[in-house]
Amino acid sequence: LQEAIAEAKRCLNCKNPSCKKGCPIENHIPEFIHELSKGNMGNAMAIINEKSNLPAICARVCPHEKQCQGHCVLYPKGKGIEIGKLERFVADFDTEMKLIREKLPQKTRGKVAVIGSGPAGLTVAGDLARQGFNVTIFESQAEPGGVLMYGIPEYRLPKQVVRQEIEKIEALGVTFLLNCVVGKQLNIDDIFAQGYDAIFIGSGTALPKSLDIPGAGLRGVIQATYLLHMANIYNEGTVGRDKVPVIEGEHVAVMGCGNVAMDAARTAVRMGAASVTIVYRRTEADMPAIQAEYQAALQEGVKFLWQTSTTEFLGDEDGKVVGLRANTPEGVKEYAFDRICLAVGSRPASRIVSTTEGIETDDNGYVLVKERPFGMTSRKGVFAGGDVVHRPQTVVMAMK
């Protein structure tokens, strides 16, 4: 506590705080830090809650150096306020001490269905519940959380933290329907028929992209999201080690250089891979991953092949991948690998919109929405937000 207060006291409490401008959800950063500096933990948490329903999560996975912290006026001098750590401290303190007891309005403003319980769905559900709406989340998995639960590794985002944040959403009166696949078991029309006044689609981008090159169908070429999902449920004790698609001693390549690629590479290290190499067609400067994750990967022994554009995956006579061929600054080269993970992006699955009339999407399947009323689709009463609307970004961008 004393360390957190001391760090908070370094804040200059700027008149025009650039840190707030750097936050996609415009969190009241100087205000919560000011309360923390005085030891007013409850006030600090209440201020954070005004903008964020998932502070303990954002504090752990946000790219702070690109957002709030990177915009701090002290950052160029190497002395930027550790905003993420302060938010994490306050959120964890609140979880442990249960400081906040919100007075909730009666649920009299209508009935809203939220599809998906990732960052976007949880944020919308929490906000609406606080405003007096009766909210139900339809979730396809056995446990809520979406990408927070199944797509981000335990070492970066402990699942207990996710569960605690979801419990806070439940405490607002939000109901969860689990193992409920919208677009398969029921569609948008069915949900409206159940008496819902509005529907929010926050289903994210569940469909991973592949590479249109020879050998993409070889055995041993897998999606990074699948590796992360299986590793997460293995860590939970739900499946055995044999279900995780990286075998101890394998030489693993990861295609791509975003945060998912870093997560997959570091997970492969933890699964006992003999070597892990990230293959990226651009330079280190072009890398979209968070710098802290890149540095952590380096420290864990992950290697990097820059400006290496893969043209073919190589296989043996049994259809098993054995390596790749790529164009490099030194010419065409071949590299031997036992396993190749694809982390080259994802896009929305069509299951929800294809089973419902009147919801327009672009050519890539992203749901088209209006500015006014904000987030409304081409179908009246149906709204959408998060990664299903824009290309996959960070947790906090999905919340925005």
Task: Please report, for each region that a protein language model flagged, where it lies by residue.
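Core beta-strand elements of the Rossmann-like FAD/NAD(P) dinucleotide-binding domain
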Residues: 192-198, 247, 331-339
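Rossmann-like dinucleotide-binding cores of NAD(P)H-dependent redox enzymes
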Residues: 134-137, 141-172, 176, 265-312
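Feature captures the FAD/FMN-dependent oxidoreductase FAD-binding
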Residues: 106-107, 111-115, 163-213, 312-323, ...
